[in-house]
Amino acid sequence: MAFYFSEPSHTFGEYLLVPGYSSAECIPANVSLKTPLVKFKKGQEECPLSLNIPLVSAIMQSVSDDKMAIALAKEGGISFIYGSQSIEDEAAMVARVKSYKAGFVTSDSNVSPDKTLKDILELKDKTGHSTVAVTEDGTANGKLVGIVTSRDYRVSRMELDTPVSEFMTKFENLITADANTSLKEANDIIWEHKLNSLPLVDKDQRLKYFVFRKDYSSHKENTNELLDQHKRYVVGAGINTRDYEERVPALIEAGADVLCIDSSEGFSEWQKRTLDFIRAKYGDTVKVGAGNVVDREGFLFLAKAGADFVKVGIGGGSICITREQKGIGRGQATAVIEVAKARDEYYKETGIYVPICSDGGIVQDYHMTLALAMGSDFIMLGRYFARFDESPTNKVNINGNYMKEYWGEGSARARNWQRYDLGGDKKLSFEEGVDSYVPYAGSLKDNVSLSLSKVRSTMCNCGALRSEEHTSELQSRS
């Protein structure tokens, strides 16, 4: 027989924060958003792995690839590379993040010499970048034969079918540097020759990287970036409950710092088996999150099974239709509040703190602050990050407005993988996600900075300088 709750569940949109006393020290510049990512024991000096900002990007094809992971790690958060791809491809993305050299950009705008001005304009419209590498085969690491920038053509005076080879700046007229050039040396060359960009090539003239003048300031040390002990960017990776025996070792070998089981419903034997395998093979050296759950029982099940963090939320995502298709889920605010209470009780009883992640239901920036105040240690976002330049999808023009493609892991586009499978027939018989578009919003850095400035300001209004204080303030007045 079904259990009936006495009260309906609630979403973030049904709540507002009541302001509290703000001391003279309570200003945004003094607010710390550092938060634990994985579990730790009482008395431990510090959490084994923490975030500098409480934001992580969702385990989705349309959100988290290596480019997103690098951009978010620079800001202090972490991306979980999507697992709905081959093991080899996911491991390669992880490896690219771990081997990334800050300041050295792999070109994402490349054409061959036989392409036309029309192709250049379409590529610029798609990527938003005005510097296009011309390589023999049109690939990012092909033999460099020239470069096209906006100074190389005038649309009003040229035919769209003009070959790139006729108006590009040829290689012999370019200032280039060796692929082993240091960032400082590259920046010195840029300033000495008044360049906007400097291509780095190997001994065979194959393009390796670009260094851009506009990125100079961002190459300076960013005190908020999330680095491992070897000064490499921290990156996560999604896994499923089917091929984990092969996928997990490959991702660990590639350098993944933390894993997360990607499933719409985590209160299951399949997740326990996955956690059991990882603990038996690696002990506590491999950090892995699990989920999703929406209540106390689900949290305790995963915490006792060995999860390093637990994701909270079912059906709350903007492109998730699990609630419509199955009639399961829970209002995100209610789910977070209940699971946070269970986490605190578990910590009091065992001395083990298992962080929770609110996944889904964030529509406005202030919902982030609410999620933190209600007890979430960090927040997983899909639609939010899908809007940015760094997401892996195409930017398209729809009725005069720029949009980014966005689809759910339960959609037909991603349905051949295991996120929504409970076992048995591998073919998914119905969708739990949809294809959509989200308004293009520009760069990740600018938007994350704006969103977090709102979070810090609101925390000051509530008299809190740290997330845990924010939660305590809310609980004391609830």
Regions found by a protein language model. Give the residues of each.
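Alpha/beta catalytic cores of nucleotide-metabolism and tRNA/nucleoside-modifying enzymes
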Residues: 1-21, 109-112, 177-178, 184-185, ...
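Bateman/CBS regulatory modules and CBS-like beta-alpha motifs in cytosolic regions of diverse proteins
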Residues: 27-51, 58-60, 89-129, 134-137, ...
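Surface-exposed amphipathic alpha-helices with a cationic face
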Residues: 44-48, 73, 98, 121-125, ...
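Short beta-strand/loop segments at the ligand-binding rim of alpha/beta enzyme cores
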Residues: 48-57, 103-108, 171, 228-237, ...
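Catalytic cores of alpha/beta
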Residues: 67-70, 244-254, 288, 294-312, ...
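Glycine-rich phosphate-binding active-site loops on the catalytic face of alpha/beta enzymes
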Residues: 74-89, 203, 256-268, 308-326, ...
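Catalytic beta/alpha-barrel core
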Residues: 80-85, 109-111, 131-133, 176-178, ...
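Active-site-adjacent beta->alpha loops and helix N-cap segments on the catalytic face
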Residues: 86-95, 156-161, 206-226, 244-247, ...
